[in-house]
């Protein structure tokens, strides 16, 4: 039997146990259960006394880790982890996870202490962000073993601390403030090669467009050195307090975790939640009206921008005291429009991750979707028609201005290909949106 102590903002919340047969269980600490600050680690692991042995325990902790088997393999080799099973990986890199979770070995405590960090110069930052090319987990080249982080997702990413204008490696229990993403590169598929070498510019523009259109998204900036180009995204699961002297971790989880699902079921086509399931789930939000409105608005935004990867792990909730929750900002938005043509995809190949309702069956193909399908979906999920119409009309009236406003935020060396591919296709769908509304 092996255990890891689970902490939330330096308060002991419970214990993760792995039995000799590989079975996992979780037990909340009794003092945590009695605390007015108590909240569940996950909605799939509700506050209760005694051991929780459901499959959701394994799935929750597994979802704290990177999806990529290659990244997991690098963590095993870098830290000589016993295996690439979630428990063994989190024993090595669980000190700074998504949300407020810190995982430590028995006997080691998460102390509330002052912020500590090591500043990075340009050469050190470059070395840190190119280490994965030497088969080292991204960001984990420091000889100081206390810098071990876990950032979920499929993309090469790490996390760093920003202090003023300086990028830093946090030390001790100091959290990180930014997710750092490198270009995705080329993805080989059976019938196409998806060129996402400019994914940094792609995501930056998608976030800028979402922000201009009134959607809550994190701030982002492109960072460059002579050898790297990366996207630094402000973590919305961190918050400065006490006039910048304390950096808090905010409890949150993605929807795979909230639904108790493995990451292999993040797509609706693989059994994961779709629009109907998520809209029903958001009825329980502490801000249900706002969250349901924003979620449906984001569905339209994904269509307009060709953002085809809106699966359950790309939506998250804040976990609030007592078990209440609300939607976090939207994140991990990348358009598929820049990969059209050449050895890439055809427009007819682009499909949304979550289907829309149609007269017959479901619609996922971006080129086959019209405003009426959003209205049909709204009806199916008990979302008021007038609100869905208001969302569609808002996009119809504001997309060109949002594109122009986003353009003014771009750095001078921004990819012209990414800009043209996203905005030109977005304007084509915007024209379809306007025509579709006129036809209603």
Kindly label every feature range from the protein language model:
Residues 1-312, 316-440:
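Phosphate/dinucleotide-binding and metal-coordinating scaffold of catalytic cores
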